[in-house]
């Protein structure tokens, strides 16, 4: 299932950040390994679409700007 959200924070040096999922405002962890091909970094305020790896620690994957 694909979700949308807004990047709350992303540290390109560390390769980690958070996306605020819409509409429930849940914060989802994103790592550089979860970025879609061609996306090298995210920036605060970017609107994104992504899938969620539903495990113990939910993480965004296939993250792309919209």
Ranges and model annotations:
Residues 36-49:
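Short nucleic-acid-contacting surface segments enriched for D/E, G, S/T with interspersed K/R
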Residues 26-33:
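A short macromolecule-binding patch
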Residues 21-23, 52:
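Short acidic, glycine-rich loop/turn motifs
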Residues 1-13:
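Structural detector for short beta-strands of small beta-barrel domains
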Residues 1, 24-26:
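Short acidic/polar mixed-charge low-complexity motifs
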Residues 14-19:
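Short aromatic-glycine-enriched beta-strand elements
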